[in-house]
């Protein structure tokens, strides 16, 4: 994917014209100014559950100011607007990832020691190029300096909009607080609330010799977070922990249940409490998929996301053999199977709120951008129609974060948009046929490689 900057946007106008898009020179000169009135015309738009159009949308100051269908007086409405004719292509909202990690990966290594502003910007730009407009870094994330955080949060030139849970509580790397009694848990939450975070993250799991956070502690942490106005997302693996977390009032289960098949009691609890459920199926699949399917490396959609170091690793026959036969890979295959089984059961039951994410960026093989599109495919394979899977990744994912200004193509919404060369309602993998990505009304990425 070609990532646009002020320096190279003029170079790419030839590519735009070759692709059937001819923004005039005035728009090019005003690129990034935030003041240009822009019209995308002759484009089919995902409105609700249907792909409508072709029609047009107007964008002003980074937001959608009008959505026009074929019967509207488009000539009058488009007067004085800079026109981008998309020649019958398809428009969907940009995705929101409720569960990712930003700035932790460098080559084939991962960890907080890799976090720098430059590395964080690179990760956010990669998410953005793949159509993810908003990213929640759900734990393990150092607190950026105020200027860096402002760039990461509100400036499309630095990539997807950034939200964060900060370091989190009871993280497996041992670098975040591990409260042992309820009052400690409350104090830790109060301390975290003083930082520029958007959500509280808890890890409730067994990591080697580390015993999980006690129920008394996570109940206290959840209660304190709610008193301070924060939602709580919980890492979870077992059904037992998931049930206890839902009962304690956790707002979000940040992973699918993978140890056993879920039961009706759990389904009823999710519905009753309104708890969000983020399956993150690809998280475990990423452990082995690049070893099992070496032909993936020939896919340009993946190649664009790989660092040279990671590409070399995936290309190694020795690495593939060692990885594919490892105990970790075998366990991951079992977890994916159970996760999909439970996801299908929840979809069939209905009434459960799904969030979206793939835990991309936590480990090198969980590749930002590619991971989210693969996760969409898992949602469909588990039983969601493509239009509903896209709804999970857009409107529902925004709703999980209480972001009412994005996730839909509608007047007043942020112009965070993906232009596609094929209809994703026909085949969910058509979300990978990216023609352009817009964020807050700015063209930020052009084309599928």
Q: What positions do the PLM features span?
A:
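N-terminal export signals
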Residues: 2-3, 8-28
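Active-site neighborhoods of metal-dependent hydrolases
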Residues: 188-209, 257-382
């Amino acid at each position: 994917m070609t990532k646009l900057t002020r320096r190279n946007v003029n170079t790419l106008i030839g590519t735009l014209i070759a692709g059937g898009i001819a923004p005039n020179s005035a728009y090019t000169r005003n690129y990034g100014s935030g003041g240009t009135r822009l019209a995308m015309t002759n484009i089919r738009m995902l409105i609700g559950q249907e792909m409508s159009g072709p029609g047009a949308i107007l964008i002003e100051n980074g937001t959608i100011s009008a959505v026009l269908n074929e019967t509207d007086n488009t000539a009058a409405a488009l007067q004085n607007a800079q026109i981008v004719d998309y020649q019958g292509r398809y428009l969907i909202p940009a995705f929101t990832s409720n569960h990712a990690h930003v700035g932790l990966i460098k080559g084939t290594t991962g960890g907080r020691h890799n976090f720098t502003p430059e590395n964080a910007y690179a990760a956010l730009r990669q998410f953005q190029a793949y159509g993810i407009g908003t990213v929640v870094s759900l734990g393990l994330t150092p607190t950026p300096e105020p200027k860096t955080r402002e760039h990461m949060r509100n400036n499309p030139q630095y990539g997807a909009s950034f939200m964060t849970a900060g370091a989190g509580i009871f993280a497996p790397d041992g670098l975040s607080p591990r409260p042992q009694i309820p009052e400690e848990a409350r104090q830790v939450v109060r301390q975290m609330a003083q930082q520029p975070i958007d959500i509280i993250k808890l890890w409730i799991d067994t990591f080697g010799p580390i015993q999980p956070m006690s129920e008394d502690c996570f109940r206290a942490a959840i209660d304190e977070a709610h008193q301070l106005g924060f939602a709580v997302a919980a890492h979870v693996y077992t059904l037992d922990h998931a049930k206890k977390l839902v009962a304690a009032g956790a707002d979000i289960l940040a992973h699918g249940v993978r140890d056993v098949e879920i039961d009706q009691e759990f389904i009823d609890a999710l519905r009753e409490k309104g708890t969000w459920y983020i399956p993150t199926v690809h998280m475990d699949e990423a452990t082995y998929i690049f070893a099992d399917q070496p032909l993936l490396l020939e896919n340009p959609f993946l190649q664009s996301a790989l660092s040279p170091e990671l590409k070399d690793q995936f290309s190694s026959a020795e690495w593939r053999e060692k990885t594919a036969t490892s105990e970790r890979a075998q366990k991951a295959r079992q977890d994916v199977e159970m996760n999909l089984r439970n996801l299908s059961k929840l979809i069939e039951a209905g009434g459960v709120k799904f969030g979206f994410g793939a835990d991309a960026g936590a480990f090198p093989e969980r590749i930002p951008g590619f991971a989210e599109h693969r996760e969409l495919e898992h949602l469909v394979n588990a039983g969601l129609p493509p239009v509903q899977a896209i709804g999970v990744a857009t409107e529902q994912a925004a709703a999980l974060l209480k972001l009412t200004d994005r996730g839909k193509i509608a007047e007043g919404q942020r112009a965070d948009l993906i232009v596609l060369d094929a209809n994703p309602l026909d085949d969910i993998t058509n979300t990978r046929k990216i023609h352009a990505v817009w964020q807050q009304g700015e063209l930020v990425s052009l084309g599928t490689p």
